[in-house]
């Protein structure tokens, strides 16, 4: 379960932002996770909530937005969405490197048939915003 390690990294970053801004507590954290990261949003939220206990992040609202991903052919430039069902294949969850995903799915470009297929978006996890309670300020954005 890589949700735990991602949650730890997110929490460390959020705590660092809160500390630098002199925040008493964190009110909310908005994350964007790509669907190709194969992160489970519910598991990620659970890990964040458990790890946040006893910190200024405890009680914060975790908003998680899913970024859709696409495939792009390196030969002809065609860009397309995968079938949503193909992303539910349990064997995909063994991919540790996102570049393996195109191989596991045995992808071919639907336009030209090339196997030179790359991910185009949906492969990252980012902190979009952090809402803080800072003494003397009205709900600062981090």
Curated annotation (Swiss-Prot):
Q: Which UniProt keywords apply?
A: Metal-binding, Nickel, Zinc
MF annotations from Gene Ontology = nickel cation binding; zinc ion binding
Q: Would I find Metal-binding among this entry's keywords?
A: yes
Pfam families xrefs: HypA
Known function: Involved in the maturation of [NiFe] hydrogenases. Required for nickel insertion into the metal center of the hydrogenase.
Family per UniProt? Answer: Belongs to the HypA/HybF family.
> Known NCBIfam families for this protein?
hypA
Do you know which HAMAP family this protein is assigned to? HypA_HybF
Q: Record's PANTHER family?
A: HYDROGENASE MATURATION FACTOR HYPA (PTHR34535:SF3)
Instruction: Give the protein name, as stated in the record.
Output: Hydrogenase maturation factor HypA
To which species is this protein native? Methanopyrus kandleri (strain AV19 / DSM 6324 / JCM 9639 / NBRC 100938)
Q: Name the gene that codes for it.
A: hypA
